């Protein structure tokens, strides 16, 4: 890889994608505010700003840790300068929403630490002993479901808990609406995470990482994702009194678009994948518009 290509790769991965990933969290959070706040109460922008800023900062730190060691020092100051405005946004959001809202949002990413720790006891019939394994190994190919649940708890539940504290009549908040938005978020983030696993199948096979794609193959995985997304969206929509036709169309269109991208565009295609990431959880917002609260 030439130096200009390497530079573009770092800029895309360390700066562009974190912002896009941060924006990806907004549709579920906006949907959560829609089903939670009273009709005569204005939408609460600071919690959305705080969620966006924290998501960007977490992703920037994650991408910085993945940089080659020989280039990390060179790019460190640039990364710090880039992250500074988002630190300011996070401080602004915390000042308006309170420390408890910040801790609720940060508590979910900490589950990723638990995810990588050997905490699950497993008994071996062969040796007659009990050992502990990491949760991500215990979940096997369905570990992306754990990640999707974490995203749902961060983007929806943590936001809803804060919003209920700002309401004049929190007892009027729709628990059913909150649950539906949470389930939509888990459904579509599971689709997105699994599509990314299909894209990265060769890299995961080389690193002995178990995913749906490495365990069952690309075609069966895509078929399973299409069916599970359609059934998940349809079930949630019917429970909320929404349109079954719109549900099927929505799930089919987004599954088809993401599947085509995974099959035809490599991970190095930053802009197509960045655009797809931006729309990854848009179905959550679209679904919440058609559901009754």
Curated annotation (Swiss-Prot):
Organism listed in the record: Viridothelium virens
Outcome, altering residue 63 to A: Abolishes the catalytic activity
Main location group: membrane
Any GO CC annotation of this UniProt entry: membrane
Keyword Cell membrane attached: no
Catalytic activity: (S,S)-drim-8-en-11-yl diphosphate + D-mannitol = sporulositol A + diphosphate
Top EC class of this enzyme: transferase
Requisite cofactors: Mg(2+)
Record-stated family: Belongs to the UbiA prenyltransferase family.
This protein's UniProt keywords: Glycoprotein, Membrane, Transferase, Transmembrane, Transmembrane helix
Annotated transmembrane regions: 10-30, 45-65, 75-95, 105-125, 142-162, 243-263, 269-289
Coiled-coil positions: none
EC code(s) of this entry: 2.5.1.-
Membrane topology, as annotated: Multi-pass membrane protein
Pathway stated in the Swiss-Prot or TrEMBL entry: Secondary metabolite biosynthesis; terpenoid biosynthesis
This protein's name: Prenyltransferase vviA
Localization, UniProt: Membrane
Annotated effect of mutating residue 115 to A: Largely decreases the catalytic activity
Gene name of the encoded protein: vviA
Positions annotated with a glycan in the UniProt record: 172, 208
Effect ascribed to mutating residue 192 to A: Abolishes the catalytic activity
Domain of life: Eukaryota
